[in-house]
């Protein structure tokens, strides 16, 4: 697997797809790796701190599905849930 970082534009596209999902309040970090023609994403999304484990799991599943179904050639995505920082 190549460890070269994809262009900033691709990173922004991945973040935009995840950010537009219901329940996602922010993106803490996003790591992308390329292997052949496909990409592998490791993304930490922020959700409301009071969200239940079940709600967080459902949000993560929807984000993963949306990323893998996008036209961005994402072969797999690992979505981590983080609490959105309190103001």
Each model region followed by its residue ranges:
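Alpha-helical transmembrane segments and adjacent TM-loop junctions that form the membrane-embedded core
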Residues: 1-87
